[in-house]
């Protein structure tokens, strides 16, 4: 399925699972991204990351990621160069990305001494688009626009794919 919008540069659709809901202080533990080229070619990547801090049980209850799962994973600093390369010269999209995912990504890059420069990119926040029609969550958006259930909700890979499907 092709995007409804015409791209003049790549678009990265992404989702983050983190240690909490504070984009400025919590840490990324899962980052899934789909890079869509102007010709429609898609490249998917998912990083499972060790946040360097304990994952609160109430957060694990939402996404299922435990300290044991990430204990041998790279930190964000270890993966920063690869993540930066994947996102290079791309516009950004996600569900609630403007209020959470983008600020969270900016903070993680800042902790490594890198400038993510999201202000130089266009943002397509699917939540804003959806809320203009029907104020709900990503699961409701997938049901409404795609006519299917959102299997794997609160998993970054499933949420990223669902966000791209809503965009299409």
Where does each model-flagged region fall?
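Short, glycine/acidic-enriched loop or turn micro-motifs at the edges of active sites
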Residues: 18-20, 128, 162
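Short, flexible loop segments at boundaries between secondary-structure elements
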Residues: 123-135
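Acidic, divalent-metal-coordinating active-site segment for phosphoryl/phosphodiester hydrolysis
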Residues: 155-167
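Conserved non-catalytic scaffold segment of RNase H-like nuclease domains
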Residues: 1-120, 135-154
């Amino acid at each position: 399925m092709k995007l409804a919008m015409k791209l003049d540069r790549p678009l990265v659709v992404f989702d983050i699972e983190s240690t909490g809901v504070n984009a400025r202080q919590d840490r990324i533990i899962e980052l899934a991204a789909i890079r869509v080229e102007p010709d429609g070619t898609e490249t998917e990547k998912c990083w499972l990351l060790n946040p360097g801090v304990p994952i609160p049980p109430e957060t694990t209850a939402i996404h299922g990621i435990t300290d044991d799962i990430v204990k041998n994973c790279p930190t964000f600093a270890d993966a920063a160069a690869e993540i930066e390369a994947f996102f290079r010269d791309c516009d950004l999209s996600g569900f609630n990305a403007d209020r959470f995912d983008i600020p969270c990504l900016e903070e993680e890059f800042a902790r490594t001494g890198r400038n993510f420069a999201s202000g130089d990119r266009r943002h397509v926040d699917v939540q804003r688009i959806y809320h203009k029609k029907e104020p709900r969550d990503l699961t409701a958006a997938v049901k409404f626009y795609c006519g299917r259930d959102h299997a794997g909700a609160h998993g970054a890979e499933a949420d990223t794919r669902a966000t791209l499907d809503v965009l299409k």
